[in-house]
């Protein structure tokens, strides 16, 4: 399980950086953008989206060094010249016997310094999931805490592409704390005010991919999903889905989920989104054979190939109450009706 998670972590980080660099490249800069070095107010009725990916190292108060496996990816709305809101996925590296990651909702204050430099201070609630051991038994611990950061941006491309240095501090309730220094890239995008999903159409998608229980020595399985999604304006959507997680002898769940989605269009054809909601499932490997209520957390990148068809990549995390958390990396194809 540890090797698989390392491969997944590298894939997520590498693909995030490569994709962000591609989308923010000179060939994608709009001709009508302002020449000013720092972001300015968006055009009326047009959202401005910020995306970033950072990587680095740090230490935890339990387990020590993160072994250069800490990283964070996030995206959100730029509200004005100074304030933004974000959703982020944070992986706190690999301290000894701890593999903690999770999702944070952040408020951010940005202060321009000079022509190309800006200081940024962010903080918000952080829901974490830690794969560890308690009394020599595998445990998936869930805790709430606060993720706070101070960062410096240097804009390489005016009003667009920037380099970022970020210091993170995680303060947990009843768990260990951590500090990390991260380096990476980011970009501001003029979000399309009318993304494809905002036209009121129902989107039906099918998904397939890998499914891995967050325990040592558990084989990887195939997972599948069928989903129906509807928009709520330009920034939100809701969905209902049937989820099959495979059966590896430890977890064999299937069930139905409902999620609320935050949707951020970064190009006329590209959209980032994150969803969360309840997931009711039955586990064939559970002796009680009873229904259980879990949480399904998702992050997704979508390309609108045509007006009717979209292709997507998605990461699902099934957060359980019985130490059988599951990671699903999936590709999907959806059609608008």
State what each model feature region is.
Residues 2-16:
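Bacterial N-terminal signal peptides that target proteins for export
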Residues 53-61, 69, 89-95, 125-133, ...:
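Transmembrane beta-strands of outer-membrane beta-barrel pores
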Residues 126-142, 147, 151, 269-304:
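Outer membrane beta-barrel transmembrane domains
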């Amino acid at each position: 399980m540890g090797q698989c998670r390392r491969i997944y972590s590298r894939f997520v980080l590498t693909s995030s950086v490569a994709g962000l660099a591609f989308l923010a490249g000179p060939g994608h800069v709009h001709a009508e953008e302002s020449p000013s070095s720092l972001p300015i107010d968006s055009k009326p009725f047009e959202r401005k989206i910020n995306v970033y990916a950072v990587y680095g190292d740090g230490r935890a108060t339990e387990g020590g060094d993160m072994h250069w496996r800490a990283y964070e990816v996030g995206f959100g709305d730029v509200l004005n010249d100074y304030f933004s809101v974000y959703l982020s996925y944070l992986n706190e590296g690999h301290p000894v016997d701890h593999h903690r990651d999770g999702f944070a909702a952040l408020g951010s204050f940005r202060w321009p310094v000079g022509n190309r430099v800006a200081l940024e201070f962010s903080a918000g609630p952080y829901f974490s999931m830690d794969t560890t051991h308690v009394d020599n038994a595998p445990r998936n611990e869930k805790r709430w805490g606060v993720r706070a950061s101070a960062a410096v941006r240097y804009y390489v491309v005016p009003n667009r592409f920037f380099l970022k240095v970020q210091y993170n501090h995680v303060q947990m309730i009843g768990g260990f704390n951590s500090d990390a220094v991260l380096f990476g890239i980011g970009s501001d995008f003029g979000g399309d005010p009318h993304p494809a999903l905002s036209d009121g159409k129902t989107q039906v998608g099918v998904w397939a991919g890998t499914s891995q229980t967050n325990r040592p020595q558990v084989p990887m399985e195939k997972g599948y999903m069928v989903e129906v999604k509807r928009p709520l304006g330009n920034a939100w959507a809701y969905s209902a889905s049937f989820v099959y997680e495979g059966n590896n002898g430890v977890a064999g769940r299937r069930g139905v989920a409902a999620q609320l989605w935050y949707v951020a269009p970064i190009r006329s054809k590209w959209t980032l989104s994150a969803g969360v909601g309840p997931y009711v499932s039955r586990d064939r490997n559970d002796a009680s054979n009873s229904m259980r209520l879990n949480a399904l957390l998702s992050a997704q990148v979508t390309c609108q190939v045509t007006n009717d068809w979209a292709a997507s990549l998605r990461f699902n995390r099934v957060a359980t109450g019985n130490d059988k958390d599951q990671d699903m990396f999936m590709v999907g194809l959806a059609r608008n009706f």
